[in-house]
């Protein structure tokens, strides 16, 4: 393989003709269905969840709320775990959370015998929230004095400082930014605003996963970014 050579992708024909098997094609017919209840507020705390009516839906197998799961935290990026704290993702997310930080945060889950039963159960759940003002811009997050996460009181969960040199090349900057407009000939970008469109991988596979027991282990089958 080299420059100017056209190399066919091994799975291209199978993907465009529908012959390729995706994760959703591999789910067993008798598998239970899990669905997640998402928050309808952007910032606040879940005070109570009433699941009594949801349990009355035929086919419901189990219901879990943010009050039923451990307070274990994990990172959401899916990168390999590093034992070096400087090179690992921030673990600040619970599988179901009482502290809502964005519209759509996961607060409860339903397991049922069918997709329809799971959806009806979600619609029957009643949630009592204590809503807080949403912080919708970086400026609001910085000056509000309201921490979005207890581990990041300044609302900076992560930070990458970079500069643009005289040749318009972007470089990461490891030092401390000063109030001067330039640092050694580099432009200080703190006062500059950038607007970018929404990003999407444009994958052709639905977002889903399934799991099954193998002895005492749980095997999870999920898509990746390949």
Q: What are the functions of these language-model segments?
A:
Residues 9, 47, 93, 111, ...:
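Generic structural signal for well-ordered, non-membrane alpha-helical segments
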Residues 161-167, 176-177:
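Basic- and hydrophobic-enriched, low-structure N-terminal and domain-boundary segments
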Residues 175-226:
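Conserved beta-alpha junction segments in alpha/beta enzyme cores
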Residues 39-41, 166, 196, 215:
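Non-catalytic surface loops within mature trypsin-like serine protease
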Residues 16, 173-175:
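Short, low-to-moderate order helix/coil transition modules at the start of elongated helical scaffolds
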Residues 1-162:
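Flexible, low-hydrophobicity surface segments
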């Amino acid at each position: 393989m080299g420059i100017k050579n056209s190399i066919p992708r091994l799975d291209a024909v199978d993907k465009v003709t529908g012959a390729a098997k995706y994760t959703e094609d591999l789910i067993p017919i008798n598998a239970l269905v899990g669905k997640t209840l998402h928050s309808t507020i952007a910032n606040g705390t879940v005070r109570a969840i009433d699941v009594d009516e949801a349990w009355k839906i035929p086919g419901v197998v189990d219901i879990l709320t943010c009050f039923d799961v451990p307070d274990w935290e994990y990172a959401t990026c899916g990168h390999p775990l590093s034992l070096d704290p400087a090179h690992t993702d921030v673990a600040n997310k619970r599988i179901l959370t009482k502290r809502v930080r964005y519209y759509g945060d996961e607060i409860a889950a339903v397991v049922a015998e069918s997709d329809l039963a799971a959806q009806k159960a979600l619609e029957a759940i009643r949630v009592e929230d204590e809503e807080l003002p949403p912080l919708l811009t970086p400026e609001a997050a910085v000056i509000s004095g309201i921490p979005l996460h207890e581990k990041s009181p300044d609302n900076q969960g992560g930070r990458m400082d970079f500069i643009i040199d005289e040749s318009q090349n972007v470089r990461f900057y490891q030092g401390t930014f000063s109030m001067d407009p330039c640092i050694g000939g580099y432009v200080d970008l703190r006062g500059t605003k950038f607007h970018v469109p929404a990003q999407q991988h444009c994958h052709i596979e639905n977002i889903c996963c399934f799991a099954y027991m193998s002895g005492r282990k749980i095997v999870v089958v999920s898509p990746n970014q390949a």
